[in-house]
Design a protein with these regions (language model features):
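Extended, charged amphipathic alpha-helical segments
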Residues: 338-518
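Generic, well-ordered alpha-helical scaffold segments in large soluble proteins
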Residues: 188, 192-195, 220, 416-430, ...
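Extended, helix-rich architectural segments
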Residues: 1-367, 486, 492-493, 686-688
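Long, highly charged low-complexity segments enriched in Glu/Asp and Lys/Arg with interspersed Ser/Thr
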Residues: 608-653
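Short coil/turn segments at secondary-structure boundaries
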Residues: 200-208, 219-222, 431-443, 508-515, ...
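Long, low-complexity, intrinsically disordered segments
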Residues: 660-689
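Extended amphipathic alpha-helical segments with heptad-repeat/coiled-coil character used for oligomerization
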Residues: 220-221, 228, 232, 519-618
């Protein structure tokens, strides 16, 4: 070989791809088998086992609630009924009450035309250092102007009064600006709710609330959304274009898939798990999302799912109750993933290999979010919320103090449902027995070929003489007594008790058999108002436990990540579900009465155009009319007032805004001095003035 020549090794594309895969596999193995990841997985398994065992009694209650709504007996009770024989009828009282409660809550919270929440300014907006300096500058300008006009310095009392006047005027303008920001923030959140599936999730949440010991909703959670966009092609035609964007979404969490830490009362008190049954499409959608391990997801898609975290027996029973039959034969592969939200001690994180920069204080607890699927950790990050809040909100139809799980309607009226079922079964059995006679046949007097198992009209009975010479009939008929009236009385009594125990009276969903005051329209209105007290407590639970925290989290999300600075400000979330519970027709009448009563010059001077416009907006919204198209916005009104106010709004006293000095007058009001002072008039005493 000649000197100075070198040999280059040529590597094929397949070889390069193989080397890249091997390098990626080594990096994935090192990452997944690191001391930190192994420690996290071990800790999560211990927490999961405790939460799964503690959830078992609640799962039994929820399965019983599903059967109760579906009109099915418990397996042991159904076996006893079949052993005894007779009717297996099931009266659907629970289903009727649950549907009525759902309809009532949806009418209050979803069908009012306005969202059950509002964004308002705080009573006293916080002043930033820059705004404080603006107030000081305005006060200095006032002092300088007074020195120019009055040629004297202000006293201490005048300084304090002037400073307070400047601050009040500034705060008033600040409140107006904050209200404009609040309106824009409200529109922004309403748009995010519409695109993020809030209405659908909240609708399912209400069904869970009426049925199970707790209902849970999740959000905002940042996910990839596939939307349809429109653009012009080369020929100028409008064509569809699929778009992918990252945006907040909301979802109803199945109570069967939520596992809280044993012994906690609220979600914020401890850790929790959510079980995710993921299809391949749902799992692949996580690729490219912030915080997820793309290589682990791709490896999982290649290998398939081999670990089941949940109780398969409970899963199959639940799916059958939901009329999802033979799901084990489903060809689509389902991956069982667990999502963990909770605290991990800094000491454990240090022991698992995290540095002092990542974990400054080992004595503190750090909020973490971890996804585990199969043998892989898909995501392990610290909680992105500045206060460590978890993206869940839950409440119950009836809350039990100190307990995480409350009670749903099926659990509340379970005993009543059982009594009504027993009365209905006895009634049906008694009706069957008493529907015809009991037949007694003397076999000694019946020919051998006579069929005594059938009875029908006009049947001819062949009999022989009684060998003993008795005159008794060979065939005797006995009519059993009917107890239908007594059994119906028992059923009616206990079905009325279901109204009282559930707080959902029958006349709310169209029962016309109302006695007493309910026979008149005003009396029925009073009864419905009284019945509203029971549901008001449930609505207050939804307001405080679900609507306010969810909307507040969306507000914080927009404050942190939205680029539009015009929506940001010192604002607060006000839930309005309990307010919507009031009779809307009565409220609309009262609003219109107030609108007419305030249509006079005195009230107009007090309210001003802004106040009148605010009143018109509320009336238009309550009538489900387009308020923004009927009443101009605050900015439009302000521009119109400035445009028309020009000279009319100039300060009195001529140019410069100087106040004209008052003209000296006599005690009777006439002017002193000048041309008017030279006019002689007669005063009240008859003398000249």
């Amino acid at each position: 070989m000649a000197a100075g020549l070198s040999i280059f090794r040529v590597v094929s594309n397949d070889e390069l791809a193989r080397q890249e895969r091997e390098q990626s596999d080594r990096a994935l193995a090192e990452r997944q088998n690191s001391e930190l990841m192994l420690g996290i997985v071990s800790h999560l398994r211990m927490c999961w086992d405790a939460a799964k065992i503690a959830k078992k009694p609640i799962e039994d209650i929820m399965l019983k609630a599903m059967r109760q709504r579906n009109g099915e007996y418990e397996p042991d009770k159904l076996a006893a009924i079949k052993k005894q024989g007779g009717s297996e009828v099931y009266m659907m009282i629970t289903e009727v009450k649950c549907r009525a409660a759902e309809s009532w809550l949806r009418d209050i919270l979803l069908d009012t035309g306005t969202p059950p929440w509002d964004i308002q300014t705080t009573p006293i907006p916080d002043l930033s250092p820059a705004q404080t300096e603006e107030i000081k500058a305005a006060f200095a300008d006032m002092v300088a102007q007074l020195l120019q006009t009055e040629l004297r310095a202000m006293t201490l009392a005048e300084q304090a009064q002037a400073k307070e006047a400047v601050a009040q005027e500034y705060r008033f303008k600040l409140l107006q600006a904050a209200q404009n920001r609040a309106d824009r923030m409200k529109l922004k959140i309403a748009d995010q709710f519409a695109q993020g599936g809030w209405a659908e999730s909240f609708n399912d949440f209400i069904t869970d609330l009426a049925t199970y010991p707790a209902a849970i909703i999740k959000g905002p959670v940042v996910r990839r959304q596939r939307t349809l966009g429109w653009e012009k092609d080369e020929s100028g035609r409008t064509v569809a274009k699929p778009l992918d964007k990252i945006a907040p979404e909301y979802e109803r969490v199945d109570p069967f898939n939520f596992y809280p830490e044993p012994g906690i009362t609220n979600i914020r008190d401890g850790y929790c798990f959510q079980h995710h049954p993921l299809t391949r499409t749902m799992l692949s959608d996580l690729i490219g999302m912030p915080g997820y391990d793309e290589q682990a997801i791709r490896r999982l898609l290649q290998e398939g799912n081999g670990t089941s975290w949940i109780n398969q027996d409970v899963k199959l029973i639940k799916e059958e109750e939901e009329r999802k039959y033979y799901t084990e034969m489903r060809p689509t592969e389902i991956y069982d993933a667990l999502e963990f939200w909770g605290k991990i001690s800094g000491k454990m994180l240090r022991e698992w290999g995290m540095s002092e920069d990542e974990v400054p204080d080992p004595a503190l607890e750090y909020d973490a979010n971890v996804w585990v699927c199969g043998d892989y950790v898909l995501k392990a990050v610290l909680n992105y919320d500045p206060l460590g809040e978890k993206p869940y909100a839950k409440t119950s139809f009836i809350k039990c103090p100190g307990a995480f799980w409350g009670k749903g309607i099926p659990e509340i009226i379970e005993d009543i449902q059982n009594v009504c079922n027993a009365a209905a079964r006895a009634l049906v059995n008694n009706m069957g027995i008493s529907s015809g006679p009991q037949v007694e046949v003397n076999l000694e007097r019946i020919p051998a070929n006579e069929d005594i198992t059938q009875i029908y009209p006009w049947k001819i009975w062949q009999v022989t003489n009684d060998p003993t010479g008795s005159s008794a009939a060979a065939v005797r008929f006995t009519q059993p007594e009917t107890n239908a009236a007594e059994l119906m009385g028992v059923y009616d009594k206990f079905s009325r008790l279901a109204d009282e125990h559930s707080g959902i009276p029958a006349y709310l969903y169209g029962d016309l058999n109302v006695q007493g005051a309910g026979r008149t329209s005003s009396g029925l209105s009073m009864l419905m108002g009284s019945a509203g007290k029971a549901i008001r407590q449930v609505v207050m639970h939804i307001d405080s436990d679900v609507i306010k925290p969810i909307v507040t989290r969306q507000y914080v999300y927009n404050m942190r990540y939205d680029d539009d600075e015009s929506i940001k400000g010192d604002l607060q979330v006000v839930p309005r579900g309990a307010i919507n519970l009031a009779n809307r027709e009565t409220m609309n009448v009262r609003r219109i009465e107030f609108l007419n009563a305030s249509a006079n010059p005195l009230d107009a001077e007090i309210m001003g155009p802004d106040g009148r416009a605010a009143l018109l907006r509320e009336v238009a919204k309550s009538l489900q009319m387009p308020a923004d198209e009927i009443v101009p916005s605050r900015e439009t009104l302000a521009l119109a007032q400035r445009a028309s106010g020009g000279a009319a709004g100039a300060p009195p006293g001529g140019p410069g805004g100087q106040q004209a000095k008052p003209t000296p007058t006599h005690p009777d009001g006439s002017s002193k001095g000048g041309q008017q002072g030279n006019v002689v008039t007669t005063n009240a005493s008859g003398g000249a003035a």
